[in-house]
Amino acid sequence: LKSRVLIVGAGGLGSPIAIYLAASGIGKIGIIDKDNVEISNLNRQIIFTSSDIKKNKSSIAINKLRKINPDLKLQSFNKKLTAKNINQIAKNFDLIVDGSDNFRTRFLINDYCLEKKKILISGAISKFDGQVYTFNFSKKKSPCLRCFISHTPTNLDVDNCEYEGVLGTLGGIIGSIQANEVAKEILGIGDTLCGHILVIDALK
């Protein structure tokens, strides 16, 4: 495959997304994450081990993916995604997969993909709940994240996992579904979640 996929966040969602996409033979994967690995991440960020603590997530993740698929083109961005740098970073990617953990970044990615008519596959996890959204902005009637979230959260930078906690396995469930949505969009097969919200309650 020659598709180019940018993963925003190498955390609980980004980890399984990156692993499955690398193994599937995606042409190029970019990962952006400015954070370092912490011991509290290890219950859900399965691409990392205890030997990676205090090291940059995006750089370590890229090294792990290279071992899975040495033919894969990889690019690491050790920085925070902002309105000033998003076009420079994302313009050469076909699909954006949002694994971020705050609304400010989610809205930034949503608005950029809407403007540039890119495909966006967004996921979110908190406590025992997870959601997946697919937006194909090349289609005229595709909704966007703001269509589903009518009221802007008071704290756009809130990190749900940090303050509320999250079931470790939930990241794997939602991240795998996001990776599956990427595959369906690239291959043009099956029914995607475009226009829908998939909600997972891990306690049911």
Regions found by a protein language model. Give the residues of each.
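Adenine nucleotide-associated cytosolic modules
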Residues: 1-204
